[in-house]
Amino acid sequence: MKLTLWTYEGPPHVGAMRVATAMKDLQLVLHGPQGDTYADLLFTMIERRNARPPVSFSTFEASHMGTDTAILLKDALAAAHARYKPQAMAVALTCTAELLQDDPNGISRALNLPVPVVPLELPSYSRKENYGADETFRALVRALAVPMERTPEVTCNLLGATALGFRHRDDVAEVTKLLATMGIKVNVCAPLGASPDDLRKLGQAHFNVLMYPETGESAARHLERACKQPFTKIVPIGVGATRDFLAEVSKITGLPVVTDESTLRQPWWSASVDSTYLTGKRVFIFGDGTHVIAAARIAAKEVGFEVVGMGCYNREMARPLRTAAAEYGLEALITDDYLEVEKAIEAAAPELILGTQMERNIAKKLGLPCAVISAPVHVQDFPARYAPQMGFEGANVLFDTWVHPLVMGLEEHLLTMFREDFEFHDAAGASHHGGKAVAREESPVAPADLAPAATSDTPAAPSPVVVTQASGEIRWMPEAERELRKIPFFVRGKAKRNTELYAAHKGVCDITVETLYEAKAHYAR
């Protein structure tokens, strides 16, 4: 156990809540002390759901610790069934309740309720949230789904979408459209939007689409064994992956590949004149394994970025992520410590970060552009608009999402480049009002360690980092710093790094304007 101000994943019972909240007519009963979890806040504030999550609590207190707390769980189960009348129920223990070793399986059986009650085994001290969601969904599918006759037409199940998932709602809609172009209907989408009665119909489909391995792979593997349903292995995030996904579906079903790329813009836009701003941009990627692997492929092969670092916080995806990282000559970072992630980002010196809400905070601290690609996320990443990550429309959304932080418009570049101009500095006023511009008095450049931090409105100018060499330390002269700030900030970091490398190679301690332009000429060859 450790004290931290950020965690990428909650305990396993949070994953159970995500599955229960995604479904209809299912009630989850959590056995735990008062204040041990916070279901309402997660789903009504962050995801902005218009209904409270279907979660009930036994809520024992300190005064109950010397008594039989199992009675409280028994009463909570009976009360939840009487009040909500669900089609099925699930029961789980929170972290603290696990220490008491109450038996939810035996208690639920003794009640003899008229609906299925699925006990969940969620080891709170060795596993985390994604495992909890995956195991909860698997347990529900195992308890309710049975083999049955297939539908006359080719159908599939969509597996893995949950509450609090990153763009899961829109991904389901986009994948449904993709499959419809091949004449394939969706039999059941689960857990998102499904009821326990819907889970009983899972066996009717011809195959399963595994949308999110983190939360649906165990259920997909169970259905493969129990109902003889194959499942897809490719996640359709990005243009190439979407085409590969449709080819995989064609191989499973025997249907011809039919695609509608009439609305796809990402490939052309990536190859357009603006691609000169994109090609070679250094990018660091961190998040859940599925989204990181997909993002690395898009960044390297579809947009033209250089992937300089990648990692994930969920250890269940460590093996496939290490395999993917090796393709780019990288060693994968597998950690759930945000401080380690921050150190890795600083060491990699990227020009763009793709990550979670935590990486957005790290990017603000370091003055780097960032785009969110993976849960956990905050309220702004649950948009009211349609914004999928999967399919061809998802590729368009990803292109916009990644490029916008780089500030493609020339306005900001020009404002930064001419910040010191006599007509455009802050004290001159608006030039289009006909004011009389007066040249501002030059002030000496503050030392690197005393320079004020960049505001949120002004892109951070990279303060000269002192690099210690055998011959002494490298310093930026004031006139060189001023010249560096005239370089558009979307390439300023690269120019700064190249200049310092050139100076170190030449044994130059003081970087002047001449050094800056010599380095530019050297690396332009």
Swiss-Prot record:
Alphabetized GO MF terms: 4 iron, 4 sulfur cluster binding; ATP binding; metal ion binding; oxidoreductase activity, acting on iron-sulfur proteins as donors; oxidoreductase activity, acting on the CH-CH group of donors, iron-sulfur protein as acceptor
Impact reported for D36A: Retains 13% activity
Residues noted as binding substrate in the record, renumbered to the chain: G409, L410
Outcome of substituting D274A: Almost no enzymatic activity
Cofactor binding, note field: Binds 1 [4Fe-4S] cluster per heterodimer. The cluster is bound at the heterodimer interface by residues from both subunits.
Entry keyword Transferase: no
EC code: 1.3.7.7
Biased composition (Low complexity): 444-464
Cofactor(s) the protein needs: [4Fe-4S] cluster
Keywords from the named record: 4Fe-4S, ATP-binding, Bacteriochlorophyll biosynthesis, Chlorophyll biosynthesis, Iron, Iron-sulfur, Metal-binding, Nucleotide-binding, Oxidoreductase, Photosynthesis
GO biological process, one term: photosynthesis, dark reaction
Reactions catalysed, as given in the entry: chlorophyllide a + oxidized 2[4Fe-4S]-[ferredoxin] + 2 ADP + 2 phosphate = protochlorophyllide a + reduced 2[4Fe-4S]-[ferredoxin] + 2 ATP + 2 H2O
Alphabetized Pfam families for the sequence: Oxidored_nitro, PCP_red
Pathway: Porphyrin-containing compound metabolism; bacteriochlorophyll biosynthesis (light-independent)
Binding site for [4Fe-4S] cluster: D36
Region (Disordered): 433-464
Protein name per its UniProtKB record: Light-independent protochlorophyllide reductase subunit B
Cystine residue pairs: none
Residues forming the catalytic site: D274 (proton donor)
Oxidoreductase found in the keyword field: yes
Gene symbol of the encoding locus: bchB
Record text on subunit structure and interactions: Protochlorophyllide reductase is composed of three subunits; BchL, BchN and BchB. Forms a heterotetramer of two BchB and two BchN subunits.
SUPFAM superfamilies: Helical backbone' metal receptor (SSF53807)
Family: Belongs to the ChlB/BchB/BchZ family.
